[in-house]
Amino acid sequence: MIEFDNVTITQPGADRPVLDGVTGRIRESDLCVVVGRTGSGKSTLLGAINSLVPATTGATMSGRILIDGRDITGTRPRELADLVGYVGQNPLAGFVTDTVEDEVAYGMEQLGIAPSTMRKRVEETLDLMGIAELRRRQLVELSGGQQQRVAIAAVLAAQPRVLVLDEPTSALDPNAAQDVLSAINTLVYDVGLTVVLAEHRLERVMHTADSAVWLRSDGRAVFGPTADVLARADVRPPLVELSGVLGWPSVATSVRNARRKVQDEGPHVVLPDLPSEPVAWSDAGLTRVVEARGLTVRYGSQLAVSADLDLHAGNVVALMGRNGSGKSSLMWALQGAVASTGTLSIAGSDPRRVGDAEARTLVSLVPQTPSDLLYLPSVGEELEQADRESHAPPGTTRAILTRLGADLPDDRNPRDLSEGQRLALVLAIQLAARPAVVCLDEPTRGLDYQMKHELAAIVRRLADDGACVVIATHDVEFTAQATDRCIVLADGDVVADGPTRVVCCASPGFSPQVAKVFHPHDVLTVAEVSSALAAQGLAKAPA
């Protein structure tokens, strides 16, 4: 269905191709997942399938891409609308109308489709994506998962043969992600569409993917069945990592598959059982740095969050909950950056009633898009500015950056850094004032598994140095690996609060894959399984 014939793509100003001699084939009606480290060229490959690359990027391209036998080289993206549908990472940014029904119809209007045909297709597409009841809703009022399904519906109305999705679940909570992926599976298995998607959280999609494309760091690509490709790839989701630790000859791609392998292939490691009664969170021996009572944020008549909260030094705390549950609003309220009511004390002061200089010593916040805080042309200038604004000795922020494990040249433009490097730079800038509380809003978006491991080590060092680290996230695997305590929000209220392993194991929606594989045993991560194997003489502990 899709053939890549020696495709090489070089971005403007780059000294080497991001894709180099890519050759391979994706079969018709496959669900194909594109995998690779951050910056390996996944978005570039997806963009090339509908000619967004090189048409809109200024990149140079050689080789050919054929879709259903048609050479699309040099074709304008608009001319491929009936062949390839494309949905980018931020569906809301791509909407051009106000309501769901208008958005689904818009693309067909631009293609000049007859009104009678258009009306029929709109109805069919709304039903197919399960959004018929949303037809008159304002797009901005929809949840993230609903917006994603509308974006897919809008391109499906033109009846393309191929659907390309760039990070379709990266901004979604686990349940919303499952809704979107269920809709995608329907398109593949019931409609026969060919779907190509990139997704950093492979644990969400690899169990249903028919095939995979691994983009290597040298620009080359490996095509093949999902399990075979993941066994070789340099990105290792939890089940793939677990397969290696347990010595299985083939990787498990689903929880069901892994549970069966544990029974049939072993090794049969002894693990503790979950406690019969939930263990409550205890602050014994901890120093309280945050005390909030009735902390409430409203946007007009809409209640965003209302919470009583105590947070402690040396702890890493996860804020979880569905999209719109109040996680980001709570963190902005802790920083004093949004209007709120109720009492708030951080290290003895209320950040809403102090000057900017003192506020920096109370709470720092790294937003979902860290680059929003970078506005100078070089890393060195950003570091020097942070020292001045924090009234810190020269070199303070550079020393923090080094401690975070990022050795970035002073002359590098922040816009040229990887996602992980930008996150480390912004975190160092925010830490220059030595805040008591460090807030991170969805820090794992755009990070591959190795970068998540590095981020987990960073936040643990921050906590060990005495900070309270608060992380708003949908990433249950990262939560299991990096946090001590988990607070779940729903409609602005705290509905669960306790040790991470207790809260995560109590809810299927927030359980990491390893916990599901070994349920009812008390284990959250591959590292815990590896340690148990080593303790029982069944395997060596990781170096």
Kindly give the residue locations of the regions a language model identified.
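Conserved ABC transporter NBD signature motif
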Residues: 58-70, 342-350, 359
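Conserved ABC ATPase "signature" region
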Residues: 116-134, 392-410
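ABC ATPase nucleotide-binding domains
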Residues: 227, 231-288, 510-543
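A short, surface-exposed alpha-helical micro-motif characterized by mixed small hydrophobic
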Residues: 205-207, 479-481
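Catalytic Walker B motif of ABC-type/P-loop ATPase nucleotide-binding domains
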Residues: 163-166, 438-441
